[in-house]
Amino acid sequence: MSRHLSGFSRFLVVWFGQLVSAIGSGLTGFALAVYVFQLTGSAAHYSLVLLAAFLPSLLLKPIGGAIVDRYDRRLMMIIGDAGSIAGVAFIIVMMLLGVKSLWPIYLGSIISSVFVALQNPAYKASVTDLLDESHYSKGSGLMQLSESSRYVLSPMIAGMLMSWFNLESVLLVD
């Protein structure tokens, strides 16, 4: 019985990390889109930032899944998170350097989204490594909760944070 608990406990640690990562990624995508809208007043630019933040990940997940099946899943999660952080860091650096163009926001969002396409399948595939079959349904439910939080909680949190802090500070939360 303790083996089941330790496996589920290990899963909870990974799940919580992914929950924070999903909320952070959603927060970044939404905050950047709102910032671009405030800057340009253009709904088209707002939409393009959201597209850059989410579409590459959606399109590349099948390829990410194939890569994850060939390599260590923990390593793929680490690489995915590191790449996602690099995309956001690129945006922050460009803003701190005073670049007033939209291209760094688009490029950084795309970079971050591409690496999420590696990290997400690795996380989902690791469930079978971390859990016994009797805990699959619990694990699956928690995974769905963390994925949904990206789209439900992130915009609310981003809106609150952006009313108190500047964009760079909000991006650092991710």
Question: Which residue stretches match the model-derived regions?
Answer:
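Small-residue hotspots at the loop-to-helix junctions and early N-terminal turns
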Residues: 28-31, 35-50, 141
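Short, Lys/Arg-rich, polar N-terminal cytosolic tail immediately upstream
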Residues: 1-8
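Substrate-agnostic recognition of the 12-TM MFS/MFS-like secondary transporter fold
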Residues: 12-29, 53-68, 72-87, 104-163
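Symmetry-related core transmembrane helices of the 12-TM Major Facilitator Superfamily/SLC fold
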Residues: 103, 169-174
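MFS-fold secondary transporters
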Residues: 28, 37, 90-95, 112
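Helix-loop junctions on the cytosolic side of multi-pass membrane transporters
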Residues: 98, 123-129, 171-173
